[in-house]
C-alpha cells in the first residue's frame, strides 16, 4: 500500500474512516459502526465501502462483530475482481 501499511489500514477499519485511491478512483471505507441495545450491548456491526468517483456502494455488510465485518471486507473481491490483500499494493492511502 502506497503511503502506509496495509495492516494499519485494516486495523483502522475497526474504529475510523479511511480513504484510498485505486486505479484512479477514490474510495471511502466507513469504519465499523455498532448498533447497540438500550442496555449498551452490541446488537450488530456494519462496515461499508463507497466508490466516491462513481457514487456507488461497493461493499456493505452487517455482522455480529467488528472482526467478522473486517474479515468479510478482506475476502470481498471488490477491487477489480481482487480481494484486499491481492490489490493493496495498487492502493494509495490518502486523506479525505
Residue ranges and their predicted role:
Residues 14-52:
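Amphipathic, interaction-prone secondary-structure segments
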Residues 39-72:
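Intrinsically disordered, low-complexity regulatory segments enriched in Ser/Thr/Pro
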Residues 1-19:
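Short acidic, Pro/Gly- and aromatic-enriched capping/linker segments at domain boundaries
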Residues 10-11, 21, 50, 71, ...:
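N-terminal non-cleavable signal-anchor helices
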Residues 59-96:
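Mixed-charge, Lys/Arg-enriched low-complexity segments
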Residues 4, 27, 36, 74-75, ...:
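N-terminal cationic amphipathic segment used for targeting or macromolecule association
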Residues 24-27, 32, 55, 64, ...:
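Short linear sequence elements within intrinsically disordered, low-complexity coil regions
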Amino acid at each position: 500500500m502506497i503511503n502506509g501499511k496495509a495492516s494499519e489500514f485494516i486495523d483502522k477499519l475497526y474504529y475510523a474512516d479511511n480513504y484510498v485511491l485505486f486505479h484512479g478512483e477514490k474510495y471511502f471505507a466507513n469504519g465499523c459502526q455498532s448498533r447497540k441495545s438500550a442496555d449498551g450491548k452490541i446488537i450488530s456491526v456494519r462496515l461499508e465501502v463507497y466508490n466516491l468517483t462513481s457514487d456507488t456502494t461497493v461493499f456493505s455488510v452487517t455482522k455480529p462483530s467488528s472482526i467478522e465485518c473486517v474479515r468479510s471486507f478482506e475476502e470481498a473481491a471488490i477491487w477489480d475482481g481482487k480481494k484486499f490483500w491481492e490489490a493493496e499494493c495498487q492502493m494509495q492511502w490518502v486523506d479525505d
